[in-house]
Amino acid sequence: MKKRALISVFDKDGVLELAKFLRDRDVEIISSGGTYKYLKENNIEVKEISEITDFPEMLDGRVKTLHPLVHAGILAIRDNKEHMKTLEEREINTIDYVVVNLYPFFEKVREDLSFEEKVEFIDIGGPTMLRAAAKNFKDVVVLSDKKDYEKVMNEIKENNCVSFKLRKTLAGKVFNLMSAYDAAISNFLLEGEEEYPEYLSVSYKKIQDLRYGENPHQGAAYYSSTEFDGAMNSFEILNGKALSYNNIKDLDIAWKVACEFEETACCALKHNTPCGVAVGENSKEVYLKAYDADPVSIFGGIVAINRKIDKATAEEMVKIFLEVVAAPDFDEDALEVLRTKKNLRVIKCKNTPQAKNYMVTVDGGILVQGEDNKLANEYKVVTEKEPTEMELRDMIFGMKVVKYVKSNAIVVVKDGVATGIGGGQVNRIWATKEALERGKGGAVLASDAFFPFRDCVDEAAKNGIKAIIQPGGSIRDEESIEACNEHGISMVFTGVRHFKH
């Protein structure tokens, strides 16, 4: 029985080689639209789909392959006598290969196009053919990914057929693709309508397999959103090896912290926790301030700066071992210096972080919430003493940092530098003591949540703290206010909590 292949592709890379391979094996090629024209121009013998259906393309190409003569040829089960009898009676030929890739909706939805223009890139005929072929994978070879062309050709060369195992895998890839494609369309159409829809569909594409996850015994891979360009799916590696699982997680937080500030800022980070954060006039100044805040923890850590890195900064950075250095850009002479460290990963972050929903898996489900991107609308002074202008600036700085520290979280600040960070403690007094121990000489203390008792204020006073900022909201707020008044400390309530679990 003569074999037939239906080829209809938007991305034509590799399709000429595949079509020629099939024609050399006497497989009849059927195509439509631009693919038909492309194959014809490249001397591939091909039939136009309208010759099969006796029906022209219509509605500006919206209807080309949506026809019973096409889909019956794909869906007919070859060892089902009734199916084959129906095909014979209707003079319908079987289709044995379906080679289709889709309109680039993933790419176009991210471009600056009108709503109507984006809608035109929603493919209908392609998914219909792919789904039909994938359902009937026992009899039809379905190719939705150009990376699989060679696998199919190799099996045909070796065995004169495509194995059941590969057919099944290719069919699975179709439905995997279609779920992502449909998710992207769904999210596009529901954007701004339902913040938390009835069914959660997310669309991510694998960028790379990672060597391992958090630990060597854990497998891992990195997936990129198909729907928007965030900071972590658009960076460029300018030096060093590929990023690890831990590198990517840490870089994400370090870059978010640095981008919290309009002024030049640096975040040094280790194990997903900031260990030194500073603002200042230039990249060298903020790096050295962040380094001095905790010269021990920064070793082997990640550093992100929200400004171009110059040679002077790079020369300071290479004095110690760092895993990753990230910035929006680098001077050429700075890159030369950084590249003297062969294993130092130098990352150009092209985008600022996008405020999207945050998801975390639990056993049997996913929790979804909005990003914690809100700061206080007003700062309410609740004590007799008011903070100075510099103390208020440090308070706001501290609240920008503390929301990235695991709760219970305390940050001690002095002159635009987080001098002490205490986090991940099961009670607030321990976090306070940890931050104060590291941040001796700090003037301002920021807390991610209210003080349940006055003990944190008393501890702060013993260590020279002059001003405190916290959300407020405890039933014992008055005790903390009274303690501040006793110690001559100013305190501000924000009304905005920043728990991080």
Curated annotation (Swiss-Prot):
An MF annotation (GO) of this entry? phosphoribosylaminoimidazolecarboxamide formyltransferase activity
Q: What is known of its domains?
A: The IMP cyclohydrolase activity resides in the N-terminal region.
Encoded by which gene? purH
Q: Which family does it belong to?
A: Belongs to the PurH family.
Keywords for the protein's UniProt record, in alphabetical order: Hydrolase, Multifunctional enzyme, Purine biosynthesis, Transferase
What protein name applies here? Answer: Bifunctional purine biosynthesis protein PurH
Q: Which organism is it from?
A: Clostridium perfringens (strain 13 / Type A)
**EC number of this enzyme:** 2.1.2.3, 3.5.4.10
What NCBIfam families does the database record attribute to this sequence?
Answer: PRK00881.1, purH
